[in-house]
Each structure stands twice: as C-alpha cells, then as structure tokens.
C-alpha cells in the first residue's frame, strides 16, 4: 500500500512540473530568429567571449564565424571587474571583498535595430592573508563563475530582443492598416 501511494505521489509530482511548463535550469528558449548569431568582441578568445559562446552552444544557437548581412550580431562591447573592500581585519588588511562584474553588449538585427544588453554579477570573497595560493585559486574560480553567470544572463536577455522585435512588427502592421484605412 505504501509503495502505491509513493508511486502515485511521484507520478503526480512529475505531471504537475511537466504541465506547468517547468524546464530544467540552464536552458533558455532562444527565439528562432536568434538561433543563428555572429559574435563580435574586442577580445574574441578571452574568457568572457568563451563563456558566452559556450552558453549559446548549450542553448542550441549556431555561431557563425563569417559576417553575413542577414544574421543578427551579438556584440560584446566591454566588461569591467571591480573589487571593493567590505570589511577589514583588526590590523587594517581587507577581510572581505565585494567583486562586481559588469558586462555591456548589444544585439544588432539585420534591419539595423540595436538592442542593448547589460549584466551585472556581484559576489563576496573572503580574503585570508594566511593562505595566499588558495586565495588566488579561489578568486579565479569565482571570477570564472561570475563570467558564466553573466553569459547566462545575456542569453536570457535575448528573449527581450525577441519581444521588442515582435512589438515593432505589431506597430508596423498597425501603421500599415491605418494608412490603408485612410
């Protein structure tokens, strides 16, 4: 009896999550018009550009290397990393730092429309002066995680580009209908 109830509850949980549109974390429904992209960056082989490419590939986006006029372009404009001291030890050395990564990008559509994208990721980092090697390794891991999170946020923001394009198409259609009515 207990096995049947457990099976029923498990089956009900699966149906509820499947029925509400639940998707596993890490996948974004990238719009069809953005399934093929070209990426430009001042540092095309840098860690941020690699993270963005990886996230796009994970979301089944084809990245085109050659420039084509009919393909949207994701342009990574710049990124900045800041370290602010949040707390200090009694001797005045930094105990905790706030790490901030700001990324500015834009999507340039084939018709020339430009949609800005921004991502900001904040993390705290405990600075232990007694373990210098471990501190450096941990700092690099945190920076990589921040770049990956910023890349995921940029990919999610592609949905806003899709919605803006749909809104622009609706406005164009309404304008054409108004012109025909006159």
Swiss-Prot record:
One of its GO terms (cellular component) is transporter complex. Keywords: Cell outer membrane, Lipoprotein, Membrane, Palmitate, Signal. GO terms for biological process: Gram-negative-bacterium-type cell outer membrane assembly; lipopolysaccharide transport. A lipid is attached at residue 20 (S-diacylglycerol cysteine). PROSITE patterns: PROKAR_LIPOPROTEIN. InterPro entries: LPS_assembly_LptE (IPR007485). It comes from the Bacteria. Gene3D superfamilies: Lipoprotein like domain. Residues 1-19 form the signal peptide. A lipid is attached at residue 20 (N-palmitoyl cysteine). Component of the lipopolysaccharide transport and assembly complex. Interacts with LptD. This is LPS-assembly lipoprotein LptE. It comes from Photorhabdus laumondii subsp. laumondii (strain DSM 15139 / CIP 105565 / TT01) (Photorhabdus luminescens subsp. laumondii).
């Amino acid at each position: 009896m207990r096995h049947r109830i457990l099976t029923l509850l498990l089956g009900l949980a699966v149906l509820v999550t499947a029925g509400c549109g639940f998707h596993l974390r890490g996948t974004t429904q990238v719009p069809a018009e953005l399934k093929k992209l070209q990426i430009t960056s001042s540092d095309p082989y840098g860690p941020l550009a690699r993270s963005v490419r990886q996230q796009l590939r994970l979301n089944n986006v084809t990245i085109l290397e050659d420039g084509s006029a009919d393909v949207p372009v994701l342009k990574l404009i710049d990124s900045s990393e800041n370290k602010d001291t949040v707390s200090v030890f009694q001797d005045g050395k930094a105990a905790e730092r706030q790490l901030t990564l700001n990324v500015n990008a834009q999507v340039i559509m084939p018709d020339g429309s430009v949609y800005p994208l921004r991502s900001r990721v904040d993390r705290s980092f405990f600075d232990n002066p007694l373990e210098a090697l471990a501190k450096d390794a941990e700092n690099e891991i945190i920076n990589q995680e921040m770049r990956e999170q910023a890349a995921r946020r940029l990919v999610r923001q592609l949905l806003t580009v899709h919605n803006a394009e749909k809104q622009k198409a609706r406005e164009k259609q309404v304008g054409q209908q108004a012109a025909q009515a006159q």
